[in-house]
UniProtKB/Swiss-Prot annotation:
Substrate binds at residues 17, 47, 67, 77-78, 164, 198, 216-217, 226-227. Disulfide bonds: none annotated. The active site is at 76 (proton donor), 225 (proton acceptor). It comes from Bradyrhizobium sp. (strain BTAi1 / ATCC BAA-1182). The gene is dapF. InterPro entries: DAP_epimerase_AS, DAP_epimerase_DapF. This is Diaminopimelate epimerase. Homodimer.
Amino acid sequence: MSALANHSFVKMNGIGNEIVVLDLRDVKHVVTPDEARAVAARVPYDQLMVLQPPRLDGTEAFIRIYNNDGSESGACGNGMRCVVRQVFEKTGQASATFETRAGLLNCWQGPAPDLYTVDMGVPKFGWQEIPLAEEFRDTRYIELQIGPIDAPILHSPSVVNMGNPHAVFWVDGDVNSYDLERFGPLLENHPIFPERANITLAHIVDRDHITMRTWERGAGLTKACGSAACATAVAAARLKRANRIVQMTLPGGELTIEWRERDDHVLMTGTATFEFEGRFEPQLFASVA
């Protein structure tokens, strides 16, 4: 029987990003891809955030992040805010450090009671760090397009690694006017991205405001992607088209992103909403090896 049988979970969302938080700090078990997919079939989610016992002194937990296709991700900003809210409400803490595959994340209570800030770390721009399948000296724009050569629908994205690979396509109009559900999977799995990529359409309203929409690697079309918001804000600032503190409008809500000048860390601030608490039925994992 799966170690997840009869285990409790919490369903939350980070501005529309559907999140399941599973605290396994008292259980020595690593969730398998089959188990992650079984959970998604019963409790639909974009990301499954699994708290495991801390591996490093001074950290609250080691966080494994699963997409709904069973693959693992290095970062999920919206999911981290949900984890932070759960931990803070249980312990009364106002700050904590978590370890993820992408590194250490410092988190704290935001400027209002319903806001939480996650330090998403330092963005990476080198073509091998993103990674890309071929060399590009300047990743502010790379050669990639969808549509006819002489009239591409989308072209020349900026690429950033924000704990996972991101490609940001800049558009002049409404981000909802593009068929991201059609283009997203093609671009996510393009050969230029050996580890696949998150695909974002972004419109710069002004230097303090960007609207965006994301096809999330391993999860599909989503109402929100925190790491994509960070990547988009950083990419816009690299192009000198936006300030280092910017308001991001996503289909699910608003995030404030700051690319801190003194150390290049990216800070993401937003809400985390509780939906319900439940317990996994044993039969959910009956077909899981």
